[in-house]
């Protein structure tokens, strides 16, 4: 879910905190990618176009998306670092339950539309019914591993780990559609990053420092604002929307000061949500050595690179072509494009000289 209406709030009350850029602006950047969000977009995009990208009984749109989109980013001088979700906080269970209920409702509507032979509604609910499976994630990780493109499985929430990587200056920005990466302290958040090439959209860049400065909020007040707006770790408050949430924090400074003023539901666990936002994006939660080759293919955060020179082409062909049915010629062409981009691993932005040491 992310943070409800946060993007609109920032554009309304602090327009200087967001700006549009072309993708080429980020040449030379190392960017942490919210992998789950990325895969989900690939799965939905194929449904939206009315295609059926599959091999046998297996969907392959997620693999195709990861393969070709990564190549395009790297061709543009960008090093993607894919971050996958780990174990979610217990407080997120209620959000998963709501998603399950929504999916059941959507599936029922889909079946009704099929019975009525309403192709417009069938297409609509089919897209809404997309579910990312464990196999989708594992196949994308294998693809990245074979291509030597950096990836890591986070200890917990991917958005929190992305924020930590950015705060620690191991990457330069975070690419996700979920605005809660700002709550975890990500200095720079990029939206539309995954679709900027395919849909020719500008990348929306959110600068946390400018947002806090423009709103005249502390980080603590900003997090409380986001909890009031609605997040994954607490219930929402009936009657509190974007404008009222902003006015409450502007006037009362803290959710604690709203006790007795606002009628909080029993499951409004704002203190627990605060704790998650202020702990999951810290060194304490994320400072671990990259010892398990299953969890990551990155040896050290100070040397993040796309090692295209040592790609095992036979292994890539065996998985993508023999096992998943991709066209061998196209895959070989893609690999050649990757191997032409060796310089992207050597380009360094000036602030990388100040990267944090573990």
Swiss-Prot record:
Binds 2 magnesium ions per subunit. They probably participate in the reaction catalyzed by the enzyme. May bind an additional third magnesium ion after substrate binding. It is found in: Nucleus, Nucleolus; Nucleus, Nucleoplasm; Mitochondrion. Residues 121-252 are annotated as: I-domain. The keyword Nuclease applies. Mg(2+) 2 binds at residues 178, 180, 232. Its EC number is 3.1.-.-. GO terms for molecular function: 5'-3' exonuclease activity; 5'-flap endonuclease activity; DNA binding; magnesium ion binding. GO terms for cellular component: mitochondrion; nucleolus; nucleoplasm. Residues 346-354 are annotated as: Interaction with PCNA. Belongs to the XPG/RAD2 endonuclease family. FEN1 subfamily. Interacts with PCNA. Three molecules of FEN1 bind to one PCNA trimer with each molecule binding to one PCNA monomer. PCNA stimulates the nuclease activity without altering cleavage specificity. Structure-specific nuclease with 5'-flap endonuclease and 5'-3' exonuclease activities involved in DNA replication and repair. During DNA replication, cleaves the 5'-overhanging flap structure that is generated by displacement synthesis when DNA polymerase encounters the 5'-end of a downstream Okazaki fragment. It enters the flap from the 5'-end and then tracks to cleave the flap base, leaving a nick for ligation. Also involved in the long patch base excision repair (LP-BER) pathway, by cleaving within the apurinic/apyrimidinic (AP) site-terminated flap. HAMAP family: Fen. This is Flap endonuclease 1.
């Amino acid at each position: 879910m992310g943070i409800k209406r946060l993007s609109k709030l920032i554009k309304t009350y602090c327009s200087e905190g967001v700006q549009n850029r072309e993708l080429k602006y980020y040449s030379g950047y190392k960017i942490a990618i919210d992998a789950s969000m990325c895969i989900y977009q690939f799965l939905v995009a194929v449904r939206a176009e009315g295609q059926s990208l599959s091999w046998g009984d297996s969907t392959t749109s997620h693999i195709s998306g990861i393969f070709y989109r990564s190549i395009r980013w790297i061709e543009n001088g960008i090093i993607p670092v894919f971050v996958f979700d780990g174990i979610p906080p217990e407080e997120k269970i209620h959000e998963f339950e709501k998603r399950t209920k929504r999916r059941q409702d959507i599936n029922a509507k889909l079946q009704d539309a099929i019975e009525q032979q309403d192709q417009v509604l069938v297409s609509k609910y089919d897209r809404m019914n997309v579910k990312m499976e464990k196999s989708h994630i594992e196949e994308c990780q294998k693809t990245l591993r074979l291509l030597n493109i950096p990836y890591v499985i986070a200890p917990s929430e991917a958005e929190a780990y992305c924020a930590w990587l950015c705060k620690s200056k191991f990457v330069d920005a975070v690419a996700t559609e979920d605005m809660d990466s700002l709550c975890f302290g990500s200095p720079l958040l990029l939206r539309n990053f995954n679709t900027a090439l395919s849909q020719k959209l500008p990348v929306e860049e959110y600068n946390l420092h400018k947002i806090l400065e423009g709103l005249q909020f502390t980080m603590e007040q900003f997090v409380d604002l986001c909890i009031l707006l609605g997040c994954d770790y607490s219930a929402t408050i009936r009657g509190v929307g974007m404008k009222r949430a902003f006015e409450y924090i502007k006037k009362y400074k803290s959710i604690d000061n709203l006790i007795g003023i606002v009628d909080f539901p029993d499951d409004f666990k704002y203190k627990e949500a605060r704790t998650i936002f202020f702990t999951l994006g810290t060194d304490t939660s994320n400072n671990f050595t990259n010892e398990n080759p299953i969890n990551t293919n990155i040896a050290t955060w100070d040397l993040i690179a796309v090692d295209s020179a040592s790609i095992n082409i036979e292994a890539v062909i065996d998985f993508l072509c023999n096992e998943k049915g991709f066209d061998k010629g196209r895959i070989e062409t893609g690999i050649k494009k990757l191997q032409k981009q060796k310089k992207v691993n050597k380009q360094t932005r000036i602030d990388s000289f100040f990267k944090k040491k573990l």
